[in-house]
Curated annotation (Swiss-Prot):
It is found in: Cytoplasm. InterPro entries: ATPase_NBD (IPR043129), Gcp-like_dom (IPR000905), KAE1/TsaD (IPR017861), Peptidase_M22_CS (IPR017860), TsaD (IPR022450). It comes from Gemmatimonas aurantiaca (strain DSM 14586 / JCM 11422 / NBRC 100505 / T-27). The lineage of its organism: Bacteria, Pseudomonadati, Gemmatimonadota, Gemmatimonadia, Gemmatimonadales. Keywords: Acyltransferase, Cytoplasm, Iron, Metal-binding, Transferase, tRNA processing. The keyword Ligase does not apply. Substrate binds at L136, V137, S138, G139, G140, D169, G182, N288. This is tRNA N6-adenosine threonylcarbamoyltransferase.
Length: 357
């Protein structure tokens, strides 16, 4: 089967064509139109995002079809992100997809954005299939999942305040770095000269008590607001002493190390407790090379494997939506006539374990 995917949940207008089955998929095309205008405002402006999607969606779909060298008559179904995300942005994608499916008499498949991130890695790594432990880390979400099978998702833990990507963006602003902050912080942290165990800005690792057990409510959860505040105080101290220019790299390194140590420990706990040898990373923060390296090192010690998508498929894209759409299409799941965009919605098939409540 061949599916056209459409993604407009935030500030990327994307269209892609993916063919095959959940067991063997081929990425035929993927077009992503990023809205760089939001850099001027230091964050995504919802109304501007919606207007940019209106401008970009037709060219994106046309380019995806051309790149795949197919026409709409060659498409078996249209998959579109319907939740979660910015409602106005989502409405652009869902309205266009519904019109397209109706006009060409194609099935319409609604896809949950976060389930799409789980499928992104599968497009490049066929072995990234269940069962596995999944860490979804982006500007809006931080979720730790146990995935025994596609369509079965057990929520183990999540952030109790800021998402990881949000924390990166806010810390980047404190350090005078551009938006989005993930890549600039990673680059700045790499220039810190002192060894990891000696650099002067070592921040506490949130929610990592040595006495913690799987029965504790925070065993898998994360919290980054306190870490963000610690960075704020470090920046103010450096400003007061006139040393901020020299301290920026050290602060960035200390912040990034604290985030990575926290995420790695939570993932290792989940993999150990649920006896998973595979870890799948997803979301924009999964692009962080230091995070990937630390995660691989930790899992290799347990004879495990870590799978992460390339930067193009880690950030929001329609290829992952088409891939998840193939899975849902194979199960016979189609959109109801009254399908609409939803700002917040659990992943279909997800259950919340008691420790994640």
């Amino acid at each position: 089967m061949r599916v056209l995917g459409i993604e407009t949940s935030c500030d990327e207008t994307s269209a892609a064509v993916v063919s095959g089955t959940p067991e063997a998929m081929t990425l035929e095309s993927c077009v992503i139109l990023s809205q760089d205008v939001h850099r001027l405002f230091g964050g995504v402006v919802p109304e501007i995002a919606s207007r940019q999607h209106l401008i970009g969606i037709v060219p994106a779909v046309a380019a995806a079809l051309q790149e795949a060298q197919v026409s709409l008559s060659d498409i078996d179904a249209v998959a579109v992100t319907h939740a979660p995300g910015l409602v106005g942005a989502l409405l652009v994608g869902t309205s266009f997809a519904k019109s397209l499916a109706l006009s060409y008499d194609k099935p319409l498949v609604p896809v949950h954005h976060l389930e799409g991130h789980l499928f992104a890695t599968l497009l490049e790594h066929p072995d990234a299939a269940p069962p596995f432990t999944a860490l979804l880390v982006s500007g809006g979400h931080t979720l730790l999942l146990d995935v025994p099978a596609w369509g079965e998702y057990r929520l183990l833990g999540q952030t109790r305040d800021d998402a990881v990507g949000e924390a990166f963006d806010k810390v980047a602003k404190l350090l005078g770095l551009p938006y989005p902050g993930g890549r600039p912080i990673e680059q700045l942290a790499a220039t810190a000269e002192a060894p990891v165990h000696k650099h002067p800005h070592r921040f506490a690792r949130p929610m990592l008590r040595k006495s913690s057990t799987p029965a504790d409510e925070d065993y898998y959860d994360c919290s980054f607001s306190g870490l963000k505040t610690a960075v704020l105080y470090a920046v103010r101290d450096a400003e007061r002493t006139g040393t901020l220019d020299d301290a920026r790299a050290s602060i960035a390194r200390g912040f990034q190390d604290a985030v990575i140590d926290t995420l790695v420990e939570k993932v290792v706990r989940a993999a150990r407790q649920h006896r998973r040898s595979r870890v799948v990373l997803g979301g924009g923060v999964a692009c962080n090379q230091a995070l990937q390296a630390a995660m691989r090192n930790a899992m290799e010690q347990r004879k495990g494997h870590v799978f992460a998508p390339s930067p193009r498929l880690a950030t929001d894209n329609a290829a992952m939506i088409a891939a998840a759409g193939i899975f849902r299409l194979q199960r016979g799941e189609f959109a109801a006539p009254d399908m609409t965009a939803t700002a917040s919605l659990p992943i279909p098939g997800m259950i919340v374990l008691s420790s994640a409540r």
